[in-house]
Amino acid sequence: MKVKMKTRSGAAKRFKKTANGFKRKQAFKSHILTKKSAKRIRQLRGLKMVDKSDEAAVRRMCPYI
């Protein structure tokens, strides 16, 4: 009998599976926002897709997502 793989809980909280891959939030938007321009903060608002080169690593960290 094989041992079950463990999900890395930190990664499970950060990534969501979609039909096209994994979506993620953008970095640099949690604190020290006063020195960042409104344009920069606005552009950091949306969700992004995980790059293809990183997808295998995310899949290994979250095998059951």
UniProtKB/Swiss-Prot annotation:
The gene is rpmI. GO terms for cellular component: cytosolic large ribosomal subunit. Gene3D superfamilies: 4.10.410.60. One of its GO terms (molecular function) is structural constituent of ribosome. It comes from the Bacteria. Keywords: Ribonucleoprotein, Ribosomal protein. GO terms for biological process: translation. InterPro entries: Ribosomal_bL35, Ribosomal_bL35-like, Ribosomal_bL35_CS, Ribosomal_bL35_sf. Belongs to the bacterial ribosomal protein bL35 family. This is Large ribosomal subunit protein bL35.
